């Protein structure tokens, strides 16, 4: 048996019950692309795509590593940074695969809290207090998965200075960042910060499996060496498709932000007045985190039996919570929210 399985992804891929109305997917539904890419092998694709990613993020191609989605980018970033015995310090609650990838690579893992009392914010002092002499990487998500809390540039600057003082790096998974207009990627705030991202959550192009690391060129070279132990090179077809449709990204992003605003309003209207519930969604976020204090796994099963999908907070290390996403069809979202509202109102006292 493979050590360190990922319970959340096991649930998503094999155990998550099918439903008609879904609040579980945290990204824009998969989109078709109007322009097909070249079917002829092209050795310049990776270079041209790296240049396009660099230009979109106001940097140069030597700061770009191309990977198989954000997940692949995170694997290679952690492989590049976690030398033998190096430790990962990860936020909690968090996206389950982020820390389990480090554990799979053989790294010890510790956690620092993003507490609900602080609206799930990152406190650099709390991070520094949890560092050990073997910590090599701190990992956070921005927007925070599962709460959608943001991390301001001022906090990133402090984290970068802390990382420099301790000779470590901060990995910032920013796959959701483009839901925030005008947000500056972490790697541009401080050289000890690195960004991972992809075309998946905001752009609805997860089926291309294209992601990236943005960071210090030496780190990028190390990630390229790590790649030699996995896929070696990226396949041409998704790179060709991405480049052929690159000019569509701004429009896709604006549409995704509009979806997020509309869905958040629907969620606030459906759930914001419930007694005994803490639910204060950011009205530009793609999802929110609801606290009700009960059995989140059982409530998710009940909702699924009634045709609505929600994600239990237990998969993020936060039992008693639900992650609710709202980027799908508005009518399906309304129906799912109605089912969830009924389940919460009728839960045992």
Predicted regions and their residues:
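Helix C-cap/helix->beta junction micro-motif
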Residues: 105, 165-166, 306
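Active-site phosphate-binding strand-loop segment of PLP-dependent enzymes
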Residues: 118-181
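N-terminal small-domain helix-loop-helix segment of the aminotransferase-like
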Residues: 1-76, 247-248, 347-349
């Amino acid at each position: 048996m493979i050590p360190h399985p990922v319970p959340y992804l096991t649930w998503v891929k094999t155990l998550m019950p099918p439903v008609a109305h879904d609040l579980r997917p945290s990204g824009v539904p998969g989109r078709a692309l109007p322009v097909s890419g070249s079917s002829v092998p092209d050795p310049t694709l990776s270079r041209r795509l790296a240049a396009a990613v660099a230009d979109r993020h106001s940097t140069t191609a030597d700061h770009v590593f191309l990977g198989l989605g954000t997940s692949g980018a995170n694997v290679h970033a952690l492989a590049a940074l976690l030398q033998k015995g190096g430790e990962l310090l990860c936020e909690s609650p968090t996206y389950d695969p982020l820390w389990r990838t480090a554990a799979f690579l053989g790294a010890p893992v510790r956690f620092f809290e993003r507490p609900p009392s602080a609206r799930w914010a990152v406190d650099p002092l709390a991070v520094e207090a949890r560092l050990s002499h073997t910590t090599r990487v701190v990992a956070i998500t921005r927007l925070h998965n599962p709460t959608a809390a943001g991390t301001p540039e001022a906090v990133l600057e402090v984290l970068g200075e802390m990382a420099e003082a301790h000779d470590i790096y901060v990995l910032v998974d920013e796959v959701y960042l483009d839901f925030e207009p005008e947000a500056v990627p972490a790697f541009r705030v401080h050289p000890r910060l690195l960004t991972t991202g992809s075309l998946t959550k905001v752009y609805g192009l997860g089926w291309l499996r294209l992601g990236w690391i943005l960071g210090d060129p030496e780190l990028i070279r190390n990630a390229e060496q790590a790649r030699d132990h996995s896929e070696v090179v990226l396949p041409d077809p998704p790179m060709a498709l991405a480049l052929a449709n690159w000019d569509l990204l701004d429009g896709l992003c604006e549409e995704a932000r509009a979806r997020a605003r509309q869905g958040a309003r629907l969620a606030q209207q459906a759930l914001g007045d419930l007694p005994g519930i803490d639910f204060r969604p950011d009205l530009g976020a793609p999802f929110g985190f609801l606290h009700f204090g009960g059995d989140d796994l059982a409530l998710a099963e009940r909702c699924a039996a009634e045709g609505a999908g929600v994600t239990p907070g237990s998969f993020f290390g936060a039992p008693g919570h639900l992650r609710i996403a709202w980027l799908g069809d508005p009518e399906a979202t309304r129906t799912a929210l109605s089912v969830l509202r009924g389940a919460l109102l009728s839960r045992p006292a």
